[in-house]
Amino acid sequence: VLRAFEIEGARVRWPYEVRIGGDTIEQIDGAIYHNGHALLIEAKHYRDPANIEPITKLRAQLARRPPATIGMVFSFNGFTEPAKILARHLNPQQILLWEGAELRLAIEKNRVVSGLEAKLRYAVEQGFPDYSLSLEAW
């Protein structure tokens, strides 16, 4: 995931831990910086669609960050309906959902950053975090 964004010119921070003293308080899957946006990444590769846990984990991590920080959850086998409902009703709306098929499509087209911009635009204009990149020629 991170490498695809890096190839297209985004600055990335590879997975890291946040520590207080000697204790790890967070494990971050990565961060992306592009076009004035700062994004925290949570990536899951479960056999089944991801449930609410990755979303709630990322939401807790975002609560400790500047308000403009956006989160992105990548789930290679999609999301359960409860996960999508939760993400749609978060306040503030700051977590974008990426399904595996969308990521594969964006990588094949070398348009991962364009996909991010389409998802951000939809979230701002429509208020939903789960825009499907298969809906148009973004």
Where are the predicted features?
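Mixed-charge (Asp/Glu-Lys/Arg
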Residues: V1-W138
